[in-house]
């Protein structure tokens, strides 16, 4: 598995990329492989204050539904509206099709997340 090294990862299979003062969040290639063809991405509440690990949204496939979690404490500031009409964008390119953006309460919280090698160990473990 070749993972982008310009971002962090969670044990629940989200990727997190810093862009200015917000974190862009999506699901990993491994997660979308496990889920299969996505049919719905949503239930993301822009403006919601979340703690790390709280449910930020949901992805549904023909096989299963899975929650997406906030990687850090923060406020959801954007949802990728393109995914409402085309959830399969994640299947096509999991590492470019972001789901939501979160403004962290403390940007240093990202230091608690996994780097690419750490995530690879979890995903393959």
UniProtKB/Swiss-Prot annotation:
Chain ranges of the Lipoyl-binding domain: 22-103
Residue stretches spanning the membrane: none
Swiss-Prot/TrEMBL keywords: Lipoyl
GO CC annotation terms, alphabetical: cytosol; glycine cleavage complex
Cofactor: (R)-lipoate
CDD domains: GCS_H (cd06848)
Annotated coiled-coil segments of the chain: none
InterPro entries: 2-oxoA_DH_lipoyl-BS, Biotin_lipoyl, GCV_H, GCV_H/Fam206, GCV_H_sub, Single_hybrid_motif
Cofactor, free-text remark: Binds 1 lipoyl cofactor covalently.
GO biological process: glycine decarboxylation via glycine cleavage system
Modified residues (N6-lipoyllysine): 63
Assembly behavior: The glycine cleavage system is composed of four proteins: P, T, L and H.
Membership in a protein family: Belongs to the GcvH family.
Annotated function: The glycine cleavage system catalyzes the degradation of glycine. The H protein shuttles the methylamine group of glycine from the P protein to the T protein.
Cited HAMAP family: GcvH
Database matches in NCBIfam families: gcvH, PRK01202.1
Protein name: Glycine cleavage system H protein
Species annotation: Bordetella avium (strain 197N)
């Amino acid at each position: 598995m070749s993972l982008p090294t310009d971002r962090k990862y969670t044990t629940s299979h989200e990727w997190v990329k810093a862009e200015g003062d917000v974190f862009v969040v999506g699901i990993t290639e491994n997660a979308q492989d496990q889920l299969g063809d996505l049919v719905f991405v949503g239930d993301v509440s822009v403006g919601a204050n979340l703690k790390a690990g709280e449910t930020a949204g949901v992805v549904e496939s023909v096989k299963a539904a899975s929650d997406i979690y906030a990687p850090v404490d923060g406020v959801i500031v954007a949802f990728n509206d393109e995914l409402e009409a085309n959830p399969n964008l994640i299947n096509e390119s999991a590492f470019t099709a972001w789901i939501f953006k979160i403004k962290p309460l403390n940007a240093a919280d990202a230091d608690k997340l996994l780097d690419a090698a750490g995530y690879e160990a979890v995903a393959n473990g």
